[in-house]
Amino acid sequence: MITRRQSTEIRLGNLTIGGSAPISVQSMTKTDTRNIPATIAQIKELEECGCEIIRLAIPDMEAASALKSIRPKVKIPIVADIHFDYRLALASLSAGVDGLRLNPGNIGDPERVKAVVKSAKEREIPIRIGVNAGSLPKDLPPELTIAQKMVKAAMGHIKILEGLDFGLIKVSLKAFDVPTTIEAYTQIASLIPYPLHVGITETGTPKTGLVRSAVGIGNLLYMGIGDTIRVSLTAPPQEEVFAAYEILKSLNLRQRGPILVSCPTCSRTEVDIVGIASRVQEALNKIDKPIRVAVMGCAVNGPGESKEADLGIACGKGQGLLFRKGEKIAVVPEDELVDALLREIASL
């Protein structure tokens, strides 16, 4: 049983973050924010696959202005990602964003920081302090580890906001190195009450990035650390959302859509179990029912090994078994197994 760290609650648009609220799934658009139709279309696609928070890069005033057209067209909270220029933060707030990702120490002039905080406070808009290992301040003590530097940098940004009586704060500390990221989060989790956004940065393409993210995010979540998560991949953002839910489901922290259980195959397998499992997974991706489905490679061990599945098939040469909760309900010709399984799923 995972005991979650108790953080303060904040509101991000229509979403509660922290406290006892469910761990939220976030992604980031990969369109040019200035391309309004493309950005709206991508956000709507992400909404359909379960994304709950979307972050948009705001590189210039044209992108900030685009938010005024984007915000009314989408349902999920929008976070504007701001670097250095406080005017972009002010313009994004005026455009109606639900949150900012901003490091106040990078803005420079304290009066500019005050202007951003004043505007955010008036609108009750939270600010996420996002520290990345690759862009740490140069004046940090050299004897500190990277994780310690990340925490020190984050605490510096936090103190600026707290000094302006601003408490709608969320924090992230990301690195490519998984142990460094885990160390940074575990340190800061005991120092602050604010919600934590968890992720591993720049993990790469899905083949490697999914593994790094699952190990890093999964370890932190198992320790109870994390209120929102993002799986950062060099891939379409829908894949990030799918992966995030799989991590949450694997730890029994969230349940969205089906879980596919399939065997790794062995010499007893007499059918194309890889192809069958892939076909079933493709069909399950379009289903929201929180069920467990099994695809097993032999009729000898299949039903017993997947007895916790709501439905499943055990495939044999020429025919296979269709079963529910480990109990056989039908013998089905091999070429009809997948269709029979999908019909049973639809009837649930």
Curated annotation (Swiss-Prot):
Catalyzed reactions per annotation: (2E)-4-hydroxy-3-methylbut-2-enyl diphosphate + oxidized [flavodoxin] + H2O + 2 H(+) = 2-C-methyl-D-erythritol 2,4-cyclic diphosphate + reduced [flavodoxin]
Instruction: Name the pathway it acts in.
Output: Isoprenoid biosynthesis; isopentenyl diphosphate biosynthesis via DXP pathway; isopentenyl diphosphate from 1-deoxy-D-xylulose 5-phosphate: step 5/6
Question: What keywords sit in the KW lines?
Answer: 4Fe-4S, Iron, Iron-sulfur, Isoprene biosynthesis, Metal-binding, Oxidoreductase
Instruction: Tell me the cofactor note.
Output: Binds 1 [4Fe-4S] cluster.
Cite the binding residues for [4Fe-4S] cluster: C263, C266, C298, E305
Q: One GO BP annotation here?
A: isopentenyl diphosphate biosynthetic process, methylerythritol 4-phosphate pathway
PANTHER family, per this entry?
Answer: 4-HYDROXY-3-METHYLBUT-2-EN-1-YL DIPHOSPHATE SYNTHASE, 4-HYDROXY-3-METHYLBUT-2-EN-1-YL DIPHOSPHATE SYNTHASE (FERREDOXIN), CHLOROPLASTIC
Its annotated function is as follows: Converts 2C-methyl-D-erythritol 2,4-cyclodiphosphate (ME-2,4cPP) into 1-hydroxy-2-methyl-2-(E)-butenyl 4-diphosphate.
Q: Which family does it belong to?
A: Belongs to the IspG family.
Q: What is this protein called?
A: 4-hydroxy-3-methylbut-2-en-1-yl diphosphate synthase (flavodoxin)
**Which species does this protein come from?**
Dehalococcoides mccartyi (strain CBDB1)
Which gene specifies this protein's sequence? ispG
